[in-house]
Each structure stands twice: as C-alpha cells, then as structure tokens.
Amino acid sequence: MCIRDSTCELSMQIGRAAAMVLTENLSHRPKVMIGMDTRASSEMLEASIAAGLCSVGADVLLLGVVPTPAVAFLVKEYGYDAGVMISASHNPCEYNGIKIFQSTGYKLPDELENEIESIILDDAKVPPVMIGGDVGRITRSDTAADDYIKHVLSTIDVRCENLKIAIDCANGSSSVSAKRIFESLGADCIIINAC
C-alpha cells in the first residue's frame, strides 16, 4: 500500500486491523516487527502503526531504519508472526507506504490483505481498545541491522580487495548497511548521500 498524505489515523487503523486479523488466525498473542526507511514521515507512521497493533493486543519489536529485505529475513529468523516495512521504495519522498510480511518472510496473502482492508473500511468490525495487561508491549531491537548484515555476508562468497567502490545510498535505508557490507568484503568504499 503506497500512501500520499499518510496520516497517523490511517496507519493506526492499519495496525489495529492487522492485529485483529493476526489474532483471529493465531492461538497466541501476535508478535509483529516494524522496520522503516528514512523518509520524514516514517517515524510518525512507525509510532502510529505500533500503537494500533498494541491497542488490539499485539507485541511489537521496533527494528529502526533497515532495508526492506531485512524485515523479510528477520521476521522468519526471529520467529515473528508478521513484519511491517514502512517505505515507498522508489516513489517520491512525500509518499510513504506500508508493506506487511507474513511469518515466512513473504508478503501477506491477498485474502488477508483484503480482510485488513475490509476492517478498515467497516470500523464497526474493529474491537474496542484493550486495557491493562491485554495491551501489547513495544520493545526496540539494538541488533536488527547487525543480524541482517551478518546474514547477507554469510550468503556472499566473493571478496572485493583492491576495489574502490562508490555507493550512493540516496539517503535511504541502505545507509545503515551498504558501507559495512562492502568494507567487510574488503572494498575501499566512498559513500555519498548516507543518513
């Protein structure tokens, strides 16, 4: 879902609806991770999606700024029920988007996406906000980017010694990983437009 003029209200509704769908399909409290890119609206959307998820009882792990493939990998690696990536990929910076991954690291099936959309469009389906111990908890990961970088490096069987590489991170989420990955492979890196 790509959103122009993203709002806290809409992203909170997405979080609530996603938590409701997960709760209906699981026998335990849902665990959802959230990663984001570096767009100006990403932190705002992260907070409102997390609030929506927690308000319907899901526990949330905030990954911080990570590339989209990191969420797809880490949701499976950490054993989470779903992963959310806040990013509009190649779209202009005033846009933002929300991608939801299932526990396998693949996108949610269309039927679950349609169910989430149906709940958002029919607010009567959304359960009341939980209170007390039923409210989900939010924690932050200090190791998400490191865990993803270790995984990427474990899949690459190439060395880059004697290479000088220029990387334009375009002020995006690869800013947290590109230099570390290429330098670990032996490259001499020149990085521009890194956050």
Regions inferred by a protein language model and the residue ranges of each:
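Short alpha-helical interface patches
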Residues: 6-9, 66, 118
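Ferredoxin-reductase
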Residues: 19, 26-104
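Loop/helix-junction capping segments adjacent to catalytic residues or to phosphate/diphosphate-binding pockets
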Residues: 8, 42-43, 69, 110, ...
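Residues in flexible loops and secondary-structure boundaries
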Residues: 14, 68-71, 79, 106-108, ...
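Gly/Ser/Thr-enriched, mixed-charge loops and adjacent short helices
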Residues: 96-195
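An N-terminal, well-structured beta->alpha segment
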Residues: 4-51, 55-56, 134-164
